[in-house]
């Protein structure tokens, strides 16, 4: 039986860097080793099938969140330009080991959402979005979808083993 690969987007190629084929990546991952350590990665444009590529090396630009990486076979600026707009992916089975109490954002998908004041279930986490801060997309029991900022003040409790998380929404968050 074939296991279905779940792809994690870890960044997006935003520009070529110099003349030797390096590219700039805007990361969507908190794990720097994904952009620095050599090894297999995958590139995807829109809904195309991911294509395997070897990351040779990478470094973070000092004072910025951008990484500059070098891929095998990408050895000039024109080849680097052709990669702009592609997403950088990894297989979700290659997630870093975490300390106790930590979790991967992907683990939040499918969790039931409960209100802090009365523990009533109001919906389920259906997607994750990174827009400066991480946002949880929650499908309410009514069918409506809302974005919930993933910050400790609004999501104070997460029980992965029990399959739920608690929200303490500010007034009006679910009324829009």
From Swiss-Prot:
Keywords: Chaperone, Cytoplasm, Ribosome biogenesis, rRNA processing. Binds ribosomal protein uS19. NCBIfam families: 16S_RimM (TIGR02273). The keyword Chaperone applies. Disulfide bonds: none annotated. The PRC barrel domain binds ribosomal protein uS19. Pfam families: PRC_RimM, RimM. PANTHER family: RIBOSOME MATURATION FACTOR RIMM (PTHR33692:SF1). This is Ribosome maturation factor RimM. InterPro entries: PRC_barrel-like_sf, PRC_RimM, RimM, RimM_N, RimM_N_sf, Transl_B-barrel_sf. Belongs to the RimM family. Residues 100-173 form the PRC barrel domain. GO terms for cellular component: cytoplasm; ribosome. An accessory protein needed during the final step in the assembly of 30S ribosomal subunit, possibly for assembly of the head region. Essential for efficient processing of 16S rRNA. May be needed both before and after RbfA during the maturation of 16S rRNA. It has affinity for free ribosomal 30S subunits but not for 70S ribosomes. GO terms for biological process: ribosomal small subunit biogenesis; rRNA processing. GO terms for molecular function: ribosome binding. It comes from Prochlorococcus marinus (strain SARG / CCMP1375 / SS120). It comes from the Bacteria. It is found in: Cytoplasm. Its main location: cytoplasm.
């Amino acid at each position: 039986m074939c296991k279905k690969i779940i792809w994690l987007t870890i960044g997006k190629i935003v520009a070529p860097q110099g003349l030797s084929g390096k590219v700039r990546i805007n990361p969507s991952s908190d794990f720097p080793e994904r952009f620095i350590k050599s090894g297999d990665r995958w590139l995807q444009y829109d809904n195309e099938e991911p294509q395997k590529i070897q990351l040779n090396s990478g470094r973070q630009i000092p004072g910025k969140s951008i990484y500059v990486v070098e891929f095998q076979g990408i050895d000039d600026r024109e080849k680097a330009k052709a990669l702009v707009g592609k997403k950088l992916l990894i297989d979700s089975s290659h997630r870093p080991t975490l300390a106790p109490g930590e979790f991967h954002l992907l683990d939040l998908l499918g969790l039931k959402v409960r209100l802090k004041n009365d523990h009533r279930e109001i919906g389920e986490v259906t997607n994750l979005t990174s827009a400066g801060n991480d946002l949880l997309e929650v499908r309410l029991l009514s069918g409506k979808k809302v974005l919930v900022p993933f910050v400790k003040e609004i999501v104070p409790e997460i029980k992965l083993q029990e399959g739920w998380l608690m929200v303490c929404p500010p007034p009006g968050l679910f009324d829009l």
